[in-house]
């Protein structure tokens, strides 16, 4: 499905409810599978979270997670400690191109039985679940934080917990801290000192409290997704002064790294006010003429949104810390270069950075390829406030935000299938 979008005016005051964070939901789903008396509220309705939940509840020998990268990493660790079960974990053609070797080797250090079905280092992989007693493991610090989180999430189930040493410079710290905070929330003792993370096994008392006997259930509420909020920050930035969008449900002391949006978008003319469990976004000032040296090492998922916003505002930007974007749903840096160039942008990329030169005009009615990447579709959509735009394969948004197009209609966007 291709959608043509246009909007001359965004409704000046709107309210949108966004479902729970995909990142938090997927972590908590794994913990719930390990400790069944945990119950969850406000979980994500994304395809990725549904795939994760289905895989955790199912009994299939072949587990296909399609495009869900988080599920691939987390389930690799989960099935490694699921005693007595053997599975083949596979995914889409793109997933089979995304490396898994670093995580597999780390789990093998602990004693896990994992082998490759085809090419070494890549899915599909065969996992034979077993009891793991080793607890010391090293992993490169500059890899995807999902590898690190996968190991941390299974740690309270291990007989001796885990002592994880991160080798080199650490990236994506907020996602690691999110995982540790969620473990703390269910009563797991953790520490993160220097480059060493310790996660203790749950005591007998704590195991009973969260579900290994028959205790009173514990309910955890998932905060709404900040990555999904980013598209509304972009819409407000590109709209006229006075535009206001209220989003729920959000915390000022969020665990999500993408909450850095609040400070970044101040430079782009958006004020954020926390009211009860909501955030109110207001377009109040003219943006700065340049967004310089914006380091997204801790929040790379909002890079596409930010650069599209800057193009729409006619300002330049220089974004760094983007090295993980090359192994996402697509090579996001190259995809951005290709699609922004179609719109008339002057853009250059390296392995870990992006530079956009200020451009006054945007080419209208350009077809934006989405590369099976939900964030490409959603990041470019707000540009319809500046020029009509066509989003190819628009249904890809269901990976993280199935209601996205309906929510844009509520804001006054006009869309037509083409």
Briefly describe each language-model feature range.
Residues 1-418:
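Short, structured segments at the rim of ligand-binding sites
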């Amino acid at each position: 499905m291709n959608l043509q979008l246009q909007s001359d005016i965004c409704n000046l005051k709107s309210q949108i409810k966004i479902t729970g964070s995909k990142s938090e939901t997927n972590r908590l789903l794994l913990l719930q599978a390990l400790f069944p008396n945990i119950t969850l509220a406000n979980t994500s309705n994304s395809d990725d979270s549904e795939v994760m939940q289905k895989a955790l509840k199912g009994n299939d020998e072949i587990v296909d997670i399609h495009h869900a990268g988080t599920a691939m990493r987390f389930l690799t660790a989960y099935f490694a400690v699921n005693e007595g079960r053997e599975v083949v974990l596979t995914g889409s053609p793109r997933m089979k191109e995304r490396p898994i070797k670093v995580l597999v080797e780390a789990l093998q250090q602990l004693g896990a039985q994992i082998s490759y079905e085809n090419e070494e280092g890549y899915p599909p992989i065969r996992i034979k679940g077993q009891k793991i007693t080793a607890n010391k493991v090293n992993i490169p610090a500059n890899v995807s934080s999902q590898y690190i989180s996968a190991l941390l999430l299974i740690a309270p189930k291990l007989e001796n917990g885990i002592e994880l040493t991160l080798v080199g410079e650490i990236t994506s710290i907020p996602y690691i801290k999110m995982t540790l905070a969620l473990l703390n929330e269910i009563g797991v003792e953790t520490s993160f000192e220097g480059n060493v993370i310790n996660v203790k096994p749950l005591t007998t008392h704590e195991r009973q409290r969260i579900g290994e006997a028959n205790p009173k259930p514990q309910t955890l509420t998932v905060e709404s997704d900040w990555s999904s909020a980013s598209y509304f920050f972009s819409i407000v930035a590109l709209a006229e002064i006075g535009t206001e969008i209220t989003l729920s449900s959000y915390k000022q002391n969020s665990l999500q790294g993408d909450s850095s949006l609040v400070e970044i978008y101040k430079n782009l003319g958006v004020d954020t006010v926390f009211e009860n469990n909501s955030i109110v976004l207001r377009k109040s000032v003219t943006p700065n003429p340049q967004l310089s040296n914006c380091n997204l090492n801790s929040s790379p998922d909002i890079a596409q949104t930010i650069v599209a916003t800057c193009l729409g505002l006619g300002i330049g930007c220089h974004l760094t810390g983007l090295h993980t974007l090359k192994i996402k749903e697509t090579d996001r840096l190259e995809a951005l270069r290709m699609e922004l160039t179609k719109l008339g942008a002057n853009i250059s990329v390296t392995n870990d950075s992006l530079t956009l030169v200020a451009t006054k005009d945007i080419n209208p009615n350009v077809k934006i390829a989405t590369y099976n990447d939900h964030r490409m579709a959603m990041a470019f959509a707000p540009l319809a406030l500046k020029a009509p735009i066509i989003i190819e394969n628009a249904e890809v948004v269901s990976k993280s935000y199935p209601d996205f197009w309906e929510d844009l209609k509520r804001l006054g966007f006009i869309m037509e299938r083409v």
